[in-house]
Amino acid sequence: TTKPVPSGSPWYGPDRVKNRELEVIHSR
């Protein structure tokens, strides 16, 4: 799920959760 979000803008809704999951995966 990718949306055109301006740089510096926080993620909102499910997209933010998905982004968090991706961060966790990359953190491994």
UniProtKB/Swiss-Prot annotation:
Binds at least 14 chlorophylls (8 Chl-a and 6 Chl-b) and carotenoids such as lutein and neoxanthin. Chlorophyll b binds at residue 28. GO terms for cellular component: chloroplast thylakoid membrane; photosystem I; photosystem II. It is found in: Plastid, Chloroplast thylakoid membrane. Chlorophyll a 1 binds at residue 23. One of its GO terms (biological process) is photosynthesis. Residues 15-28 have a biased composition (Basic and acidic residues). It is a multi-pass membrane protein. Keywords: Chlorophyll, Chloroplast, Chromophore, Magnesium, Membrane, Metal-binding, Phosphoprotein, Photosynthesis, Photosystem I, Photosystem II, Plastid, Thylakoid, Transmembrane. Residues 1-28 are annotated as: Disordered. Belongs to the light-harvesting chlorophyll a/b-binding (LHC) protein family. The N-terminus of the protein extends into the stroma where it is involved with adhesion of granal membranes and post-translational modifications; both are believed to mediate the distribution of excitation energy between photosystems I and II. The light-harvesting complex (LHC) functions as a light receptor, it captures and delivers excitation energy to photosystems with which it is closely associated. The LHC complex consists of chlorophyll a-b binding proteins. This is Chlorophyll a-b binding protein 3, chloroplastic. The lineage of its organism: Eukaryota, Viridiplantae, Streptophyta, Embryophyta, Tracheophyta.
